[in-house]
Amino acid sequence: MSKVGYTAEFDPATTAKAMAYEINVSPKHCQEICRQIRGMKLSAAKTYLQDVIDKKRSVPFKQHARNVGHKRHQSGWPSGRYPVKASTEILKLLKHAEANAEYKGLETENMRIIHSTSKKGRVIQGIMPRAMGRATAWNIELVTVEVVIGEVR
């Protein structure tokens, strides 16, 4: 297992961070969710992700939008989806970052997500047997997600 660090450096006195290492979710879904929650207040991001899990609000798919249907209630971008599994994992990650901020003595009421990104992790090799003695690759892509929250002044 290789050592994975954060992609950016921030002031540890005013920020708290958390990382989910090699989780089994879609890399494309994580990228779109991280883009959407970046810059949000922590409480608003948690509410937003809970609404995505409940399928009340959708996540706009900007880069991976091929064959993605339009959503009526979404403003600003037509295509979107409801990535429930990835939203659940990122919501857990935000709760961990909030707990880290409370442990450091920071005020969590006015925290904002200043950095969120996803990176490719390992690929677990797998095969699926096919007819006539052939086989198809059936791999599992893992994702590393990192979140940094900071105080708003």
Swiss-Prot record:
Superkingdom per UniProt: Archaea
GO biological process: cytoplasmic translation
GO molecular function, one term: structural constituent of ribosome
InterPro entries assigned to the protein according to its UniProt record, in alphabetical order: Ribosomal_uL22 (IPR001063), Ribosomal_uL22_euk/arc (IPR005721), Ribosomal_uL22_sf (IPR036394)
Keywords: Ribonucleoprotein, Ribosomal protein, RNA-binding, rRNA-binding
Database matches in Gene3D superfamilies: Ribosomal protein L22/L17 (3.90.470.10)
Family matches, as SUPFAM superfamilies: Ribosomal protein L22
Pfam family, one: Ribosomal_L22
Annotated Gene Ontology cellular component terms: cytosolic large ribosomal subunit
Key word Ribonucleoprotein present: yes
Function according to Swiss-Prot or TrEMBL: This protein binds specifically to 23S rRNA. It makes multiple contacts with different domains of the 23S rRNA in the assembled 50S subunit and ribosome. The globular domain of the protein is located near the polypeptide exit tunnel on the outside of the subunit, while an extended beta-hairpin is found that lines the wall of the exit tunnel in the center of the 70S ribosome.
Subunit composition and interactions: Part of the 50S ribosomal subunit.
Protein family according to the UniProt entry: Belongs to the universal ribosomal protein uL22 family.
Protein name listed in UniProt: Large ribosomal subunit protein uL22
